[in-house]
């Protein structure tokens, strides 16, 4: 079975920025890929937090040029929240895939086995994250959109303009 493909339709500063299409590595990280896929479709309804388990209308709250663009905190919006489809946090599935360069999709965490809904898209090779963050996908279309998001970031991670997932879902 081919790996699922999901999308984010992004806006930057209230203006449409385009679509990011990602392939999820369900073949190597099925649990992590399924969490992200279901958070793209919103099919699991409301989570324990009382918020929808859905990336729609969430923001990229931390963007560091030359490093990564981070999002997925749909409960607090600032990097302190988020929730997985499995309940609060879930274990690191494996570290088979590596942070090999731009477009790698990986789980943000607060230490071992603390995966929720926060993720990041690499904009460079970040090999120091290997063995610490679970790589579960890659951007297959829309790296230009990722680059546009990267442009509004800063060394502190604060964005100059609001970066929002206006819509998201599954393509295949």
Swiss-Prot record:
Keywords, comma-separated and alphabetical: Allergen, Chaperone, Cytoplasm, Isomerase, Rotamase
CC annotations in GO: cytoplasm; cytosol; plasma membrane
Catalytic activity: [protein]-peptidylproline (omega=180) = [protein]-peptidylproline (omega=0)
Compartments it resides in: Cytoplasm
Domain of life according to the entry: Eukaryota
Activity regulation, short description: Binds cyclosporin A (CsA). CsA mediates some of its effects via an inhibitory action on PPIase.
Main location as per UniProt: cytoplasm
E.C. no: 5.2.1.8
Residue runs in coiled coils: none
Enzyme class: isomerase
Listed SUPFAM superfamilies: Cyclophilin-like
CDD domains: cyclophilin_ABH_like
GO molecular function terms attached to this record: cyclosporin A binding; peptidyl-prolyl cis-trans isomerase activity
InterPro entries: Cyclophilin-like_dom_sf (IPR029000), Cyclophilin-type_PPIase (IPR024936), Cyclophilin-type_PPIase_CS (IPR020892), Cyclophilin-type_PPIase_dom (IPR002130)
Start and end residues of each PPIase cyclophilin-type domain: 7-170
Entry comment describing in which tissues the protein is expressed: Expressed in pollen.
Entry PTM: Not glycosylated.
GO biological process: protein folding; regulation of protein refolding
Family recorded in the similarity comment: Belongs to the cyclophilin-type PPIase family.
Function, in words: PPIases accelerate the folding of proteins. It catalyzes the cis-trans isomerization of proline imidic peptide bonds in oligopeptides.
PANTHER family the record matches: PEPTIDYL-PROLYL CIS-TRANS ISOMERASE, PEPTIDYL-PROLYL CIS-TRANS ISOMERASE D-RELATED
Name of the protein described by the UniProt record: Peptidyl-prolyl cis-trans isomerase
Species for this entry: Catharanthus roseus
């Amino acid at each position: 079975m081919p790996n699922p493909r999901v999308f984010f339709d992004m806006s930057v500063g209230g203006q449409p920025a385009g679509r990011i299409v990602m392939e999820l590595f369900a073949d190597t990280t099925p649990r992590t890929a399924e969490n992200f896929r279901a958070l793209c479709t919103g099919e699991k309804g409301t989570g324990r937090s009382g918020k929808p388990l859905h990336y729609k209308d969430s923001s990229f709250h931390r963007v560091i040029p030359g490093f990564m663009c981070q999002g997925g905190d749909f409960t607090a919006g600032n990097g302190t929240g988020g929730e997985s489809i499995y309940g609060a946090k879930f274990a690191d599935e494996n570290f088979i895939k590596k942070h090999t360069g731009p477009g790698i999709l990986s789980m943000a965490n607060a230490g071992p086995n603390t995966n929720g809904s926060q993720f990041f898209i690499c904009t460079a090779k970040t090999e120091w994250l290997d063995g610490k963050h679970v790589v579960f996908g890659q951007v297959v279309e829309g790296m230009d959109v990722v680059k546009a998001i990267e442009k509004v970031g800063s060394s502190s991670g604060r964005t100059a303009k609001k970066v929002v997932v206006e819509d998201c879902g599954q393509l295949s």
